[in-house]
UniProtKB/Swiss-Prot annotation:
PTM: Asymmetrically arginine dimethylated at one site by host PRMT6. Methylation impairs the RNA-binding activity and export of viral RNA from the nucleus to the cytoplasm. Phosphorylated by protein kinase CK2. Presence of, and maybe binding to the N-terminus of the regulatory beta subunit of CK2 is necessary for CK2-mediated Rev's phosphorylation.
Biased composition (Polar residues): 92-112
Identification of the protein by name: Protein Rev
Entry domain remark: The RNA-binding motif binds to the RRE, a 240 bp stem-and-loop structure present in incompletely spliced viral pre-mRNAs. This region also contains the NLS which mediates nuclear localization via KPNB1 binding and, when the N-terminal sequence is present, nucleolar targeting. These overlapping functions prevent Rev bound to RRE from undesirable return to the nucleus. When Rev binds the RRE, the NLS becomes masked while the NES remains accessible. The leucine-rich NES mediates binding to human XPO1.
Residue span of motif Nuclear localization signal and RNA-binding (RRE): 34-50
Taxonomy, superkingdom: Viruses
Keywords assigned by UniProt, alphabetized: AIDS, Host cytoplasm, Host nucleus, Host-virus interaction, Methylation, mRNA transport, Phosphoprotein, RNA-binding, Transport
Gene3D superfamilies on file: 6.10.140.630
Main location: host cell
Location of the region described as Disordered in the Swiss-Prot/TrEMBL record: 23-49, 89-118
Amino acid sequence: MAGRSGDRDEDLLKAVRLIKILYQSNPPPSPEGTRQARRNRRRRWRARQRQIHSIGERILSTYLGRSEEPVPLQLPPLERLNLNCSEDCGASGTQGVGSPQISVESPTVLESGTEEQC
């Protein structure tokens, strides 16, 4: 359908406005009073913030139709993963730099009791 993405944007803006109003309705507690009074006010404020957060999540899921739980990330089988350090192994300053590599050829990661060093 043509023009439906604009409706989706409007729904998102409406949801964000509602959530903003909720957060603005709960200002931080005042720093006046005894230590116990301040602690109680902060505790109640944090409880209200948690409620607002859960309400905001429900608003977003209702307006945007998102699922409650995130979609699990699909990972390759553990047998196919190995460390590949054939390029510049041990060069100073480059450890942890670059993209992780997945090698499909070698199903053996490490033999029991052996360590491979480059």
